[in-house]
Design a protein with these regions (language model features):
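Acidic (Asp/Glu-rich) sequence patches and key acidic residues
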Residues: 1-125, 129-133, 137-141
Length: 141
């Protein structure tokens, strides 16, 4: 089942949260979907990154929400997820030192997905910036 994620303004969910809102996300490159972009425009293919979020949180967080309409991840949850990714990122850097952006740093337990250092950093940055700016993340599948 597909999952697209759209970071939007918390006070206006019809307005995408993009690099025009905060320059820190202008170089983000995440996996895009048929209806989503690559992160710098606030949208990305959530199906690719949800396994990482689920595994790092031991199942506490998921972007698949059982809600028919208006499904979104609130600001405080985005902050928790950004902090979790930051902790993971710092552990990777501490344990492995100098890594290239394209080095694989995590493979899901089932082997379905693997993530590069840059992907983890970019997802962390997007979620952190979104939470700082009080954005929310609408999810659609």
């Amino acid at each position: 089942m597909g999952l697209d994620c759209y970071v939007v303004h918390g006070n206006d969910r019809d307005k995408s949260f993009t690099s025009e809102d905060d320059e820190r996300i202008k170089d983000i490159q995440l996996c895009g979907g048929m209806f989503s972009g690559n992160g710098f425009d606030g949208s990305f293919r959530g199906k690719v990154y949800d396994p990482l979020i689920q595994e790092l949180s031991n199942g506490e967080h998921t972007w698949y929400i059982e809600q028919e309409e208006d499904a979104f991840i609130p600001t405080d949850k985005l902050k928790e997820q950004a902090e979790m990714l930051e902790s993971f990122f710092l552990i990777i850097i501490d344990e492995h030192g100098d890594l290239d952006d394209q080095d694989t740093v995590y493979v899901t337990n089932d082997g379905w997905a693997e993530y590069t250092l840059k992907e983890v950093h970019d997802l962390m940055t997007l979620l952190r910036v979104a939470s700082e700016r009080k954005a929310v993340m609408c999810v659609w599948y």
